[in-house]
Amino acid sequence: MNFKGKTATAIIELPNSNILLVKRATVPFKGYWALPGGRVDVGETVEQTVVREVKEETGLKVRIVRKIGDYHERGVQDGIEYEYYPACFLVKPVGGEIKKQEKEIQEIKIANLKEIPKRLAFEHASMIQDYIHSDNPAQRNSLD
């Protein structure tokens, strides 16, 4: 089975330098911590996708703050070849309550940026590092 396509990923910024992570319940990367996100549906923009996927996976309504970047992920994991082109966005919660989607998510965790798990899915560690090392100091200071 192969997976290929455009995806959208969210860094959900919470108070006190925390972000929200999800533990994947599906392959590839089953059991790995990840940023919420998923595949872009036909006729959908990446911005619409990130808002929809966060709501589906975590129960949170979010607003997009800014785009972190565009990425290319390619590899084989759990016997599955994948090639994704994710757009990563910084988002903030504006409503809803944290509630995991049973089908795709094993667990939801609030993680401090200083204590991010080493075992992350896809290129999510790079996305988090890009967020932490943002060129804009005002954006970095918005963590607190």
Model-identified regions with their sequence ranges:
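A short coil-to-beta-strand element that immediately follows conserved catalytic motifs
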Residues: 60-70
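Conserved N-terminal beta-strand and adjoining loop/helix that marks the start
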Residues: 1-19, 86, 90
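A generic structural micro-feature
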Residues: 2-4, 32, 79-85, 102-105
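Conserved Nudix-box catalytic region and its N-terminal flanking loop in Nudix hydrolases
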Residues: 18-56
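Short, charged/polar surface micro-motifs in flexible loops or helix N-caps
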Residues: 13-19, 28-29, 70-74, 91-96
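Active-site-adjacent beta-strand/loop module that shapes the phosphate/pyrophosphate-binding cleft
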Residues: 72-97, 131-132
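Charged phosphate-binding loop/patch that engages nucleotide di/tri-phosphates or the phosphate backbone
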Residues: 125-144
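NUDIX/MutT-family hydrolases
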Residues: 90, 99-130
